[in-house]
């Protein structure tokens, strides 16, 4: 029973960590990354469609993304979607390819992005701690129902705490890497 709780806890904490990585990867650095445009929706036959389904996005160089649209009739819609996104990008089309130059980040913008990253990291840690609380509640319920002894409860809570500490450390590592990426010119 305790092993099931630990396994579930680990899976849920891993999901929280992956969600954090996903959120943070969308925060723009000075470097061109295709994942930057992942959140963009394009108007396609009357419905919002993810950009990835109508175009191929590649990093042309360190500061330019190339968007190769599959259907030429969508070029203007894709350009408009990129332009109206809150990323502050200015695309230009050349045939079936749309080039998206990334402007250099100002020092002030970098600081703002670091604040956002730290906030995301704190949310990730809160999610992990909530998973720990749920696991500890389940363990306490087992003790209350006399399915485990107090020693087993204490041991299980210590193990859950070790798992939690490991994931909080991983969150800190992800945050440090992103901050370093944001500060690198």
Curated annotation (Swiss-Prot):
From the Swiss-Prot or TrEMBL record, state where the protein is found.
Cytoplasm
Q: Which domain of life is it from?
A: Bacteria
Which InterPro entries does the protein's record reference? Answer: Ribosome_recyc_fac (IPR002661), Ribosome_recyc_fac_dom (IPR023584), RRF_sf (IPR036191)
Matching Pfam families, A to Z? RRF
Q: What is its main location?
A: cytoplasm
Q: What terms describe the molecular function in GO for this protein?
A: ribosomal large subunit binding
Keywords from UniProt, A to Z, are: Cytoplasm, Protein biosynthesis
> Which family is annotated?
Belongs to the RRF family.
Protein name per the record = Ribosome-recycling factor
Question: Which species is this UniProt entry from?
Answer: Haemophilus ducreyi (strain 35000HP / ATCC 700724)
Query: What does UniProt list as this organism's lineage?
Result: Bacteria, Pseudomonadati, Pseudomonadota, Gammaproteobacteria, Pasteurellales
Gene that this sequence comes from? frr
């Amino acid at each position: 029973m305790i092993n099931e709780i630990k396994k579930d806890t680990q899976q849920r904490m891993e999901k929280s960590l992956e969600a954090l990585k996903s959120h943070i990867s969308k925060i723009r650095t000075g470097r061109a990354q295709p994942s930057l445009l992942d959140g963009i929706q394009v108007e396609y036959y009357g419905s919002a469609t993810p950009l990835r389904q109508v175009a191929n996005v590649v990093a042309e160089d360190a500061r330019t993304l190339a968007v190769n649209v599959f259907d030429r009739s969508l070029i203007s819609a894709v350009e408009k979607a990129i332009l109206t996104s809150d990323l502050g990008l200015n695309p230009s089309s050349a045939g079936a390819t749309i080039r998206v130059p990334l402007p250099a980040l100002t020092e002030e913008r970098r600081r703002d992005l670091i604040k956002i990253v730290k906030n995301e990291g704190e949310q990730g840690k809160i999610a992990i701690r909530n998973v720990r609380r749920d696991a500890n509640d389940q363990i306490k319920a087992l003790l209350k129902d006399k399915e485990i002894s107090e020693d087993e409860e204490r041991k299980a809570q210590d193990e859950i705490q070790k798992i939690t500490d490991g994931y909080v450390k991983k969150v800190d590592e992800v945050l440090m890497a992103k901050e370093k990426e944001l500060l690198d010119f």
